[in-house]
């Protein structure tokens, strides 16, 4: 389910933001270490990542179904040739979007959405600045926006193993969304 939710968030943001950003990506540590200089060339852009499961509560009296609460984080980044404030507020040029506008657009596109999945509606969480700094001629700004949702997972009976059904020559999938 986690992969399906992350892909649905990426697709909704890609469709909704359109040419406002250069792309919507899965986050894989691009802001860590020396990769930052390369990532800045993609700004304005958005990254989506699964931030973790924060709770699993039994949903039935037999404790065979659990409501799982998961968090997803959307990173928005932009740069401006000028001050650090310009990277947040945007500028006069079409490509000078600004991280504040990106944050507003991402929240508008995601809050209260299920994206056609069997999940709870996305709830907004914290929004925080990851960093704002001057890099040579450009100023950059990156913010993280948290979203929460829930879904249900069924537990196997004690001692049981998943038993996939196989028809014909189709490969059995034990673990699937």
State what each model feature region is.
Residues 1-31, 36, 52-177:
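Charged, amphipathic alpha-helical segments and their flanking helix caps
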Residues 41-56:
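A short, hydrophobic beta-strand-centered structural micro-motif
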């Amino acid at each position: 389910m986690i992969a399906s939710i992350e892909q649905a968030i990426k697709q909704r943001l890609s469709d909704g933001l359109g040419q406002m950003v250069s792309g919507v990506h899965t986050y894989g540590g691009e802001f860590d270490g020396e990769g930052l200089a390369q990532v800045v060339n993609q700004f304005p852009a958005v990254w989506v990542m699964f931030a973790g499961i924060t709770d699993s509560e039994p949903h039935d009296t037999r404790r065979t179904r659990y409501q799982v609460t998961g968090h997803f984080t959307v990173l928005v980044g932009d740069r401006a040739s000028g001050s650090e404030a310009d990277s947040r507020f945007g500028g006069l040029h079409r490509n000078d979007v600004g991280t504040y506008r990106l944050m507003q657009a991402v929240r508008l596109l995601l809050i209260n959405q299920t994206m056609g999945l069997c999940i709870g509606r996305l709830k907004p969480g914290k929004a925080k600045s990851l960093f704002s700094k001057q890099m040579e001629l450009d100023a950059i700004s990156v913010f993280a926006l948290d979203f929460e949702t829930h879904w249900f997972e069924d537990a196997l009976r004690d001692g049981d193993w998943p038993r996939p059904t196989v028809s014909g020559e189709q490969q059995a999938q034990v673990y699937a969304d």
